[in-house]
Amino acid sequence: MNTTTPFKTSSIALAIMATFTTPLVAGAQSSVENSQPENTQLETTQLETITVLGKVYRNTATKTALEPEETPQGVTIIDKELLDQRGVKSVNEALRYAPGVVTEQKGAAVTMYDNFSIRGFETNNQNYYDGLILPYLAGWNLHPQIDPVAIQQIEVFKGPTSVLYGTMPPGGMVNIIAKSPQQEQSTSVGLATGSRHLVQASLDSAGQIGDSNLSYRLVATARKQDSQVNGAEEERYLIAPSLDWQVTDRTLINVNLYYQNDPAMGINSSMPVEVVKRQSPSVSMGDTNWSTFERDVLMLGYKLNHEFNDNWSFLQNARYTDASLYQENTYHLDTGFTAATGALSRNIYTTDESYKSVVIDNQLSGLVTMGNWQHNLLVGVDYQDLDGDSSYKEFAGNAAFYTFNAYQPNNHLLDKSQLNEVYSERHDIGFEQLGVYFQDQIRHGQLILLAGGRYDLFKSHDDKTSTAPTYDGKETSDHNQFSYRVGALYELGNGLSPFANYATSFEPAAGTDINGKSLKPQTGEQIEVGFKYMSADMANTLTASYFHITKFDSIAADPNDPTFRAKIQLGEVTSQGIELEGQAYLADNWDVLASYTYLDMEVKKATDATLVGTTPIYVPKHSANLWTNYYLTSGALSGVRIGGGVRYVGEMEMDATNTQGKVPSYTVTDLSLGYDLGNASDSLNGAQVNLVVNNLFNEQYYSCYNQTNCWFGAEQTVELNVNYGF
C-alpha cells in the first residue's frame, strides 16, 4: 500500500510536535480524563485546568476543568448509572434520551454503526473516545464501536467544535469517557440473559497493585444473541485493560488497551417502505447464505501528564488503532423493486476493509491572574494520520436468487458455489490532519468569557482501481482552514446563568460531483443564546437555548443517482430551534430527567433548484424525552428502584426531495426495575438485579432514506442483569 500523501509543511509539523514532546523526556505526565475517581466531588467554581493530579475533570467543550453548568454552550452528560439502568448495548441506544439527537437512523437491526445526528446534522460516524477521534474509513463501513461495558460516561457537546477538534460537523459531537484505573479496590461480575437468546458475561475490576504507585482497571465482556432480523446473529468479545503509574506527586502515566472482536454484527441491509407496512420487524431482504459482518479493532494508547507547578501543566494523549472488517451482503437499487408484485432485484457484494491510524493531542495549559481577572490559557497541537485500503466486489448468482419476493421472502436462495465475480474495485485511502489551537478562558467575578481559534491543515487521497478502468482515478482534498469561537456566561447569583456563543465549523470534502466538479470544503457557523439554572443544592438543573446553525456547501447524496454514490453540494442549509433539558428531584427518592427539542431545518441554496425549501431526512420538527426513577426506602420492598422512560420522535421527511411522503412519528416506552439484594439478606450484600424492558408496548416504527430504503426500529426486548460487586 502506498503511504499517505505528506504535508508540504511536514517538517514544520514535526518541529512543533517535537517542541511539545520535549517535556516528556524530563518527566512523565498524567492522564486527566483517565484518572478521575468515580466518587470525586467536583468544585463548581473551579477554573484551574489541573489542581490535584488525576482528580479533575476536563469537559469536552473546553478541554479544561470548566463545569458543564459554567460552559457557555449546550452540554449533555450521560453517566454510567444511567447507562446501566437502561441496559444499553451501544452508544446509539445510550443517546435515545439526549435532546437534539436523532439516533439509530438505520433502525435496530443495523447494530454495527453508531449513526446519529445532532441538531439536524449527521455526525458521519465521527465519535471521540477519551478526547481523541475514533478513526474511520469515510464512505465505507469500518468504524470502531465502543461497547458500553467500557464506558464511564458520554458527553454530548452541542454546536461547532472545530475550534478544539478540527474537522467536525456544525451540529455537535460525542465524546466517550473510558472507565479508568482507581486506587480503591473493587470488582464487579455481571451476567445477563434475555430476548433473542441473549447471553452475556462481564467483568469490571480496579484497584491499587499492592503498596505500589500503580493502579489498574480491567474491563471485559462476552456477548451473543440473535439479531432482530431472521437468520442473523450478533456476537462480541472485548477486553480493555489500563494502568496508571503515579511517578511523582506531579507526574502520572496512563497506558490503555482496547481490543474488540465482533465475529457477527447482524445484517446491513434495507427494505422498501411497502415491505415495512406489510411485514414484522424480523423480516430480512438478505440471504442467510451470504450474511457476514466481521470486525476487529485494536487500540493502544497512553496519556502523559505533568504539572510544572500549581498553575501550569502539560498533557499528551495518543492512540494507535489497527482495524479490519469483512462483510458479505446484498443490496437493491431504487429501480429494482416492483410494488405491485413484491419482486425485488438484489445484487450480491463483499467489502474487505482495513486501516492503521495514529492520533496525538498535546495540551499546554496555565492559569494567569491579572488583578481580578483570571486567564486559563490553553495551547495545543494535534495530529492524525490514517492509512487504509478497501476492496469491493460484485457477483452474479444462481437463477433462483433472482426470484426473491419481498412480500413472501425466502432467505435461502443463494448458492455460493455458483457465484461468479463480475466487478471489483480497490481503494488506497489516506489522510493527514495537523491542527494548532489556542483558547483563553477568562473569569472576572461572576462573568466567564471564552475565546479561541484553530488553524487546520488537511490532506486526503483515495486512489481507485477497478475492472472498469474508465471509472478509475484519484480523489484528493487539500484544505487549510481557520475556525474560532467566542462565548460568555454570567452567573446572576441565584442559580441562573444566561449565556451566548458564536462558533464556526469545518469539514473537508474530497472528490467531484456527478458532473465532475470538485467539491468545496464544508463550513458552518452557529449563534446560540440561552440560560442555565442550578439550585443551591445542585439537585435541580435546567438548560434552555435557542440556536441558529448555517452550513455552507453541505454535501448530500445525489437523489438522481440510483447507486447513492454520487454527491451534490447543496449550497446552504440552516437549522434553528429550541432545546430544553432539565433534571429535578421531586423527593429525596424520586428523580426526573426531561427534555424537548424543536427543530426547523431547511435547504436555502442548492445547485439543484428543486431542493431549495426542502427539509433533509432524519429531521423531526418535535421530539421529547422523559426518564424517571423512584426508590423505595422502607418496608419489605426497600431497595427496589422503579424506573422508566417515554421518548417521542415526530414525523420526518421520507426522502431528500420531500416528494415521497413522511415517516410517521412514534412514541416508545421503556421500563427499568432494579433491586439491591443486600436488603433481602446480609449475605447478598453487593448483589444487584436489573430488569429492562425496551419498547414496553412493542410499538412498531421505522426510519427511511427514501421509499425503497427503510429500516425497522427496535422491537420489544426483555433483559435481566445480575451483578455482584466486592
Annotate each language-model stretch with its function.
Residues 223-227, 239-307, 320-355, 398-429, ...:
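Acidic/polar loop-and-plug regions of large Gram-negative outer-membrane beta-barrel proteins
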Residues 115, 132-158, 177-178:
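Short acidic/polar hinge/loop motifs at secondary-structure boundaries
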Residues 135-136, 150-152, 163-241, 247-251, ...:
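Outer-membrane beta-barrel translocator/receptor signature
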Residues 55, 59-68, 72, 92, ...:
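Extracytoplasmic beta-strand/coil segments of soluble accessory domains associated
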Residues 305-309, 313-319, 323-329, 521-604, ...:
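Membrane-embedded beta-barrel scaffold of Gram-negative outer-membrane proteins
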Residues 244-248, 355, 374-376, 382-386, ...:
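Structural signature of Gram-negative outer-membrane beta-barrels, strongest in the C-terminal barrel
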